Amino acid sequence: MSTNNSVLVLKVGGALLQCEMGMARLMDTAAAMLANGQQVLMVHGGGCLVDEQLAANGMETVKLEGLRVTPPEQMPIIAGALAGTSNKILQGAATKAGIVSVGMSLADGNTVSAKIKDERLGLVGEVTPKDGTYLKFILEQGWMPICSSIAMMDDGQMLNVNADQAATALAKLVGGKLVLLSDVSGVLDGKGQLIHSLNGKQIADLVKQGVIEKGMKVKVEAALEVAQWMGQAVQVASWRDASQLIALAKGEAVGTQIQP
């Protein structure tokens, strides 16, 4: 598949929303990229905000194999926290950095097809790329889409999608280069040291050993899927590390490279 190197897909985790300095630094990096003609698409989660909102409503958070279980009664709260609050916090940070952004969700513009991922998870969605017209139009204007991971089935039912998996679908759709940013510098080994490069076999071994588990397992498997689809490495890196962001802006490799 041909890769459009002018689209960089940045996935950011919910922890970023609780770090004003981290958000400002990341948005300044994105603004510099956009000024250089780099198209940037941001995809976000918001797990910490979801947890807060659920707790405030007397509801508990349950996870299964690193994925949030989403009972129907929690869906409106999760959608509000992700497509509403989280999205607008990031849009505010983008505006402050001088970026023209478009707040959106996976449900917009016929962008993806969505279905229930696993009945045990409730209203958790699995998405596949559908139509890139809407996204490509936004990117061509030099604007930055900021996309939440709320999707919609053909019958109008909202679904909660894991943000790493959402970013995977959008990277495939626009043929972009994917970077999964979280609050850790990349994939760490059993001793807490950064692993600079991983392939499918090494990932399977580390999962078996319990070194890669839960949310990182979901993240790394999403990265591997895109790496194999695109035939190019996907980066797992940190928004906390200013030097990684500067290297990223220059197009250099950062964090852990997930190899196809």
UniProtKB/Swiss-Prot annotation:
Name the pathway: Amino-acid biosynthesis; L-arginine biosynthesis; N(2)-acetyl-L-ornithine from L-glutamate: step 2/4
Q: What is its main location?
A: cytoplasm
State the UniProt keywords alphabetically: Amino-acid biosynthesis, Arginine biosynthesis, ATP-binding, Cytoplasm, Kinase, Nucleotide-binding, Transferase
Q: Tell me which residues are marked as the site Transition state stabilizer.
A: 11, 219
Q: Name one GO cellular component term.
A: cytoplasm
Which Gene3D superfamilies does the record associate with it? Answer: Acetylglutamate kinase-like
Q: Which reaction does it catalyse?
A: N-acetyl-L-glutamate + ATP = N-acetyl-L-glutamyl 5-phosphate + ADP
Q: What class of enzyme is it?
A: transferase
One BP annotation, GO: arginine biosynthetic process via ornithine
Specify which residues bind substrate according to the UniProt entry for this protein: 46-47, 68, 160
| Catalytic activity, EC | 2.7.2.8
Spans traversing the lipid bilayer: none
Organism domain of life = Bacteria
Among NCBIfam families, the record links this protein to: argB
Record's family? Answer: Belongs to the acetylglutamate kinase family. ArgB subfamily.
The molecule here is called Acetylglutamate kinase
Species annotation: Shewanella sp. (strain W3-18-1)
What gene makes this protein? argB
